[in-house]
Structure formats: structure tokens, C-alpha cells
Amino acid sequence: METFLFTSESVNEGHPDKLCDQISDAVLDACLAQDPDSKVACETCTKTNMVMVFGEITTKADIDYEKIVRDTCRTIGFVSDDVGLDADNCKVLVNIEQQSPDIAQGVHGHLTKRPEEIGAGDQGHMFGYATDETPELMPLSHVLATKLGARLTEVRKNGTCSWLRPDGKTQVTVEYHNENGAMVPLRVHTVLISTQHDETVTNDEIAADLKEHVIKPVIPEKYLDEKTIFHLNPSGRFVIGGPHGDAGLTGRKIIIDTYGGWGAHGGGAFSGKDPTKVDRSGAYIVRQAAKSIVANGLARRCIVQVSYAIGVPEPLSVFVDSYGTGKIPDKEILKIVKENFDFRPGMIAINLDLKRGGNGRFLKTAAYGHFGRDDPDFTWEVVKPLKWEKA
């Protein structure tokens, strides 16, 4: 049997880029909670002892940006210079302006357009992907890398591994078989974890704890064998981390946010953007379309693309590829998709309830992936029933 290796990586919530994603989405949540029509494009950057939020926001909400930044950093665990950032004493810079009136008139007519008339906030193309290899209908390599990152944070916060610090990265290589276009995972080939730690712990203790408390609970036993390779903190030392170790920026982890290198990506990031930004809303609706195709048995694996022009409500194109796994021809699947999903940005916002912020709704998406999550706030993960004639 022919097999191949495929690798996906993830980072946990203390990684500087992910810290920035979470701050940007915390700002979005705060804006939408008070004013669902907020127009938000919020970027964040960070380096030693400094966080800056900047961008374009038009909102009726009263926002304390500095408090949001400090609260988000503190919740993640950045509570001292030792761990990479001190939430209560770092510099917080804010440079927020209003949305360009040129963009506002073209997209939503300064809030006068009806939902079905709202144009895309920018041009671009987005992809949605689904595969039947996991219950989440997501790629296994991505699911495992993501869950390892989440578990690292869990055992840090609950005290199981008190030597852990917030920053960390994971990577999983899976051996696959291509079954007529569908992906069948056979085993985990390599597990890599690099996690920030304090000065007190030895490399042997790190490796033992990671195997026992992180890898064992996350990776099903059936995928591990005596040949599985483990690289656990292979650099030998990772004490300096967070923004002290590396600069961070919103939108730098778009593959981790989506499908771990599977499918395709149009390049647009998600965090800090309201639903008129099709980078986000367009990607969410095509995930729902792809997932619904697989869940309804139309195909075992599927990718959907949508594209937009700024100010134009209707998509320019919709594309479907079932990688040869479709039960009916792709052109018929495409017809079903177009009949069942409304790709106009104003309607996506209504149908997926994307103008509802607050309670960490979008903040939750900003670490551990936007897709394949079992949470009612992730409305784009709800499978739509699709009617089709079985051949």
C-alpha cells in the first residue's frame, strides 16, 4: 500500500502571534457586544514590554482598549517579565482611527444598505475544506497538533505541570493512505512539542511530563507505535518566550487557524475583523458548505472556493472540488451548494449570527482553530441538511 507523510503545526495561546490574534478578537467582541453594526479592523503587535493595538474602528461602543489588552494578556498567563510579558506593567499603545469613508460608502452606504445589499468589504478569495477522516470532519494532522497545544495550556493552568510557561508550539506528522481521493490516516509518524518552561525543570522531566500529561491524553493509542518519533523540546532550552522571545502580530497564523496546510488558503486572516470583512465571513460560510457536503454523504472530502469584489454583494465565483470522492458529479454538488448557501456578506452575517459579540465569542476562535470546534458559538460548524438524489 502506498503511503505518504503530511505535517501540520499549531501554537498555543501564549505564542506572541496568537496573543495578538486574541487581543484583536477581544476588541471585536467588545465592539459588537455594545454595537452589532460596529465596523472593526483591529490589528495588534507586541514585543518586549509593549503591546500596540491599531487599525480602523467605527462604533457606537465605548471601548477601554488598554483594559482589554491587559485583561487578555493576564488571562493567558503573562503576569511577569519572567514569563515574557507583564500584563499590568507593560506599555500599551493605541492608534485607532475611523473606517475610511470611501470604504464605508461603497460597502454599507454608511449603514444605510439593507442586509442583502451590503457589499463585500474587500476583494479576495476564500476556501472551505472538509474531510471524513475525523468526527470533526477536519484533517487529523491538524486536529492532533491543535489539541496538543490546547492540552499544554490546560496542564499549565490547572497546575499539573507547574514548570510550564505560556508560549509553546506543536507539530504532528501523520502517515496517510490516499483511498481514491479520500484521506485515510494510518499512524502518527512524528510528534514535536516545543514549550516554554521555567529554570527549575530538567529536559528529562520535560520529556516525561509531556509524554504522560500531554501526548497520552490527546493522541489515540491506535495511532502510536514503537516507530513513532518524539521530539520534545529538541532545542534543549526554551526559558525566554512570549513577546520577550519573539515579536508578535495579528494574522500571522492563518494556516493554524484553518486546516493545517490541507485544502487551500486565499491569504486573508480572521482575527479583529467584523463580518463585512469577507476574509472572515466568506471563509466561515465555505467551511459550512464543505462540511455539509461531507456530512450529507455527497463526498468524502471536499473544497469550496468563493470570491468577491469590494462593494459587490454577490460572489464573483463559487467552485467545488470533491477530489474524485463525490457520489454525484462536482457540477451537481456545486448546484446544490448555490441553492442552499447565501454567499452575500450581509446574509452570511445574519444566517451565521456573526454580528453577535461579547462573552468571548470571537476571542474563543483566536486560539486552537476556527473550525472543527464543538461549541454553539461556532455557528458555521452547524451542518445544513442537503437534499440530493442518490444515484
Curated annotation (Swiss-Prot):
Gene designation: METK5
E.C. number: 2.5.1.6
Enzymatic reactions: L-methionine + ATP + H2O = S-adenosyl-L-methionine + phosphate + diphosphate
This protein's pathway: Amino-acid biosynthesis; S-adenosyl-L-methionine biosynthesis; S-adenosyl-L-methionine from L-methionine: step 1/1
Main subcellular location: cytoplasm
Annotated compartments: Cytoplasm
Record: residues binding ATP: 15, 167-169, 235-238, 246, 252-253, 269, 273, 277
GO CC aspect terms: cytoplasm
InterPro entries xrefs: ADOMET_SYNTHASE_CS, S-AdoMet_synt_C, S-AdoMet_synt_central, S-AdoMet_synt_N, S-AdoMet_synthetase, S-AdoMet_synthetase_sfam
Subunit structure: Homotetramer.
Cofactor note: Binds 2 divalent ions per subunit. The metal ions interact primarily with the substrate. Can utilize magnesium, manganese or cobalt (in vitro). Binds 1 potassium ion per subunit. The potassium ion interacts primarily with the substrate.
Binding sites annotated in the UniProt record for L-methionine: 56, 99, 246, 277
Positions that bind K(+): 43
This protein's name: S-adenosylmethionine synthase 5
Amino-acid positions noted as binding Mg(2+) in the UniProt annotation, renumbered to this chain: 9
Entry GO MF terms: ATP binding; metal ion binding; methionine adenosyltransferase activity
Cofactor: Mn(2+); Mg(2+); Co(2+); K(+)
Record-level GO BP terms: one-carbon metabolic process; S-adenosylmethionine biosynthetic process
Record key words, sorted: ATP-binding, Cobalt, Cytoplasm, Magnesium, Metal-binding, Nucleotide-binding, One-carbon metabolism, Potassium, Transferase
Pfam families assigned: S-AdoMet_synt_C, S-AdoMet_synt_M, S-AdoMet_synt_N
PROSITE patterns with a match to the protein in the record: ADOMET_SYNTHASE_1 (PS00376), ADOMET_SYNTHASE_2 (PS00377)
Family to which this protein belongs: Belongs to the AdoMet synthase family.
Keyword set includes Nucleotide-binding: yes
Chain's role: Catalyzes the formation of S-adenosylmethionine from methionine and ATP. The reaction comprises two steps that are both catalyzed by the same enzyme: formation of S-adenosylmethionine (AdoMet) and triphosphate, and subsequent hydrolysis of the triphosphate.
Class of the enzyme per the UniProt entry, highest EC level: transferase
Organism encoding this protein: Vitis vinifera (Grape)
